[in-house]
Each structure stands twice: as C-alpha cells, then as structure tokens.
Amino acid sequence: MPADARTETTDTTAATGGRRPLRVLIAADTFAPDVNGAATFTEELAVGLAQRGHEVHVIAPSWNRTHHGSFDEEYRGVTLTVHRLASYRWPAHAWYRFAWPWTVRKHTAPVIDALQPDVVHIQSHIVVGRGVAREAHDRGIRIIGTNHFMPENLLEYTPFGKRTTPIALKIAWRDAAKTYRLAEAITTPTELAADYLRDAIAGQPVLAISCGIDATRYTPATGRPAGNDIVFVGRVAPEKNLDVVIRALPLLPAALDAHFTIVGDGDMIPKLTALAQELGVEDRVRFLGFVPDEVKLRTLTEGTVFVMPSTAELQSISSLEAMASGLPVVAADAMALPHLIDGNGALFAPGDEHDLAAKLASVLTAPDDEYARMRARSLTMIEAHDINRTLSTFEALYRGEPVAAGPEGR
C-alpha cells in the first residue's frame, strides 16, 4: 500500500454549503463489486459525499488475490480513491473476502498518516473497521461507526453448532462493543436495530439513521405489468430463506402463472435449483446471478411484487430499492421489515410458505385500483429514506455537530 495516498481537497465549497470540504476515510469490510446492503450503502455514501464536494477515500478488501493497492475507481460517474487490502476468500462462503486481521493496522496506518482525514467512518467492527478504528483513535481522529452487522448471518458460515452459537454471539457482541466505544457516534439503519444494538453493546448511545437511497435512479413502471413476476434482490444465502418462496410458488393459483426472479449470487443456488426441480417449478424460477446495475434496475421496474423472506434484516436496502421502483412488498414479519410495510403490501409469518402464498396471491389478484394504491404507497414511503437526508445527517456528525435521530426505517 503506497504511503503517498494523499490527493488535494477540492477548493470548491459551493456543494458543501460554503463550508470547508472534509477529507473522509470510509473503512468497510465489504464494498463494490460485492452485492449486499452494506456494500450498497457504502457506495451510495461515498458517491454522495464526493458529489457534495468532499474528498472521499475508501479502505476495503480486494476483490481478488492480486488487486490490492491504491486505485482510482469510478462509481456512477464519480471517481473515488479506494485502498484495497490483500484479501482471501472465506472458505465456507461463496464470495466473502477478508483481510487477515493482524495485517490491517500495519497496512492502513501509512494511508491514514498520508491522508490525515478529518473523520473516519467505519461500516462494521469486524476486521477492517476494527483495525482502522484503532489506528484513528491512536491519532485522535474523529470516528463515526455504523453497524450493518447481524452476527447470526456470519455464524451461518462458521463451524459453531446450536449449542455453542449463544456463546459465540456473546463473544461477537463483546468484541463489537470494544470497537464502537472508540466512536464519537454510533449509528444503525432503524430504531429497532438501534434498540437491538444498544442491548448488545451494553447500552451505548445509538442513533437510528436510514441508509437512504437515491430514488431518482429507479424507474416505476406505468400501469400494471402484464405478467406476475415475483422479484428478490440480494445474496442467495441461507439467512435469506429463499426456499420459503420457492415452496410457496406451487401453492399459488395456477391461473396466475407466477414466476420468481432472483437477482444475486450465493452458495444456496444449487440447493434452491434442486428444490425447484423437486417441486416441479424449475421453469418458473430464474437465477440471474450477479448482473450489471442497469439489469437489476430494469428487473425491478418490470416486476409485479417484491418479496423479502429474510428474518435478519436491519433495514433491507433491496426492499427500499423495490419501493423506489414502485413495487408492492411482501416481507417476513421479523426484525426491521415490518417498518417498511404500511398499505404497500403485506407481512407473512416467517418461514410459513402457506401464509406467504396467501399474501402474494392477495397482491397479485388485487383489483387494479388497489394494486395502484399499493404502488403509490411504496413511492410515498420511500421519500423518508431520501439519500440527501442521510448525507446531511452524516455530514453533521463528521463535523461534530449534534443531530436528531433519523431519518430511520419506521
């Protein structure tokens, strides 16, 4: 990692309200081209801050074994300096890569010394966030911490059994608390997630700030789609419970001819493919895998209803993306998802394919005027998650200014 990582802060102050632009260093354990909520938010945050005139740097794992160092990378027309750490694939996971924990401080200290950032914003406490937070703390740099992490999601890929999982969870949250104590402010996407985090890290103050999305990037369809396409976007991982959706497909009225499109990749695809074949619905399930952004956006626009069967969502950015695309949402009644459903779809009992089928059918068979109201309600609800509100809130935190909790995912 080259020590000479400094670039000049822009002289333009118009985009920052006439105030001095900030030099922001974002530390993330997952970043583009990864496809998951934390990576999506980190990209949105970095791009949005750069568009406001701030100098933005990102530290993240490399996406392969050789691409490590400092690079100019372009995201949605904005060039960011990304400092890629040598990384290795987690053996039990389809795509997750991590830097060796004992190397992070050594490799990031020269970058921090060269940049002298005004603020460090960590996106997790796991590996990169933990190491960078400690280096920033040693130098007296302001630290903001955002938590997108549910230990239960990571433990799916470890050898811990059911008997040892509770112990592992306690250890994971104890470790999180040590890192977040270094932060001047701790945030998480929803009030429910904030309550969960406060309990887990011994009552430290936590602000609920929505990840937010740029709704202008999404295009709601005009009118009702001709077909009945159920859409999911995200990791094809065990905790997403996509098997419940496939089991619900044959329970839907045959006349609907409903199809299920999955945008995303993951290690559950072989098992889900086999399940679809076993149930005789393989011709109605499409696995698109990793796709370019424009394909994802088009799939959302052309969909009929979005489904989120996960029971471990701290906010669910992909559900927000669906709402910005004008889709009704059917989601599991778990964690933060109920906050996203209010006249724009339905909640179903987690893990219950019969209830899911009933709720999907209620949307797919709704009269045109009722279906249009659900679409309109999604578009209205997404206004509270405008990325510009989120950016302004984080700018205030970066400058050490008090902020009110929000906008959050209620």
Enumerate the predicted regions with their spans:
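N-terminal subdomain of nucleotide-sugar transferases
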Residues: 1-84, 389
